[in-house]
Amino acid sequence: MSRIGKQPVSIPSGVECSIKGQLLSVKGKKGQMTLDLHPFTKITSEDGFLKLNPVVEDRDHWAICGTMRALVHNMVVGVTQGFEKKLLLMGVGYRAQAQGQKLTLVLGFSHPVEYAVPQGITIETPTPTEIIVKGFDKQLVGEVAAKIRAYRPPEPYKGKGVRYAGEYVMIKEAKKK
């Protein structure tokens, strides 16, 4: 069984945490996030640490407590450092261009695909075949990267498509006569 829920979350300098009942608010240099904690958990702030405990000492309550602790830790890391995901475009003529809050993708369709970037996310294209998704909300960064990848996921025969940096695509062998 994981013991993540028993570890406290350290609050670095420059981060403000406020607890109002089951609502936790974290504010840092990158932004502000709020989390509605599960009723099975109670949170306390002690000398630079946030400590989560279950309401009842039970296996299920500790499991929820571990999940909540991971979400709180991601909030603290997000408002201090932020998160980023890198995507690569593989294929002849595949390219991307970021213009403000809009991402234009040319992925071999008859038309360019336009993606409206949500609030709190910034997208950079250092090269036409590279996309970097940045933000302070880990869930939102992952969701945006997954939506961009879903436009043209890597196909198994040539590996063409949008893939995460470091993702291994299993290449199948072509059918033999």
Curated annotation (Swiss-Prot):
GO MF terms, alphabetically ordered: rRNA binding; structural constituent of ribosome
GO biological processes: cytoplasmic translation
Keyword DNA damage belongs to the record: no
Ubl conjugation listed as a keyword: no
Signal peptide: none
GO cellular component: cytosolic large ribosomal subunit
Keyword field: Ribonucleoprotein, Ribosomal protein, RNA-binding, rRNA-binding
Parts of the chain that traverse the membrane: none
Quaternary structure and interacting proteins, as annotated: Part of the 50S ribosomal subunit.
Function: This protein binds to the 23S rRNA, and is important in its secondary structure. It is located near the subunit interface in the base of the L7/L12 stalk, and near the tRNA binding site of the peptidyltransferase center.
Membership in a protein family: Belongs to the universal ribosomal protein uL6 family.
HAMAP family: Ribosomal_uL6_B (MF_01365_B)
Protein's UniProt name: Large ribosomal subunit protein uL6
Organism, as annotated: Dichelobacter nodosus (strain VCS1703A)
Gene that this sequence comes from: rplF
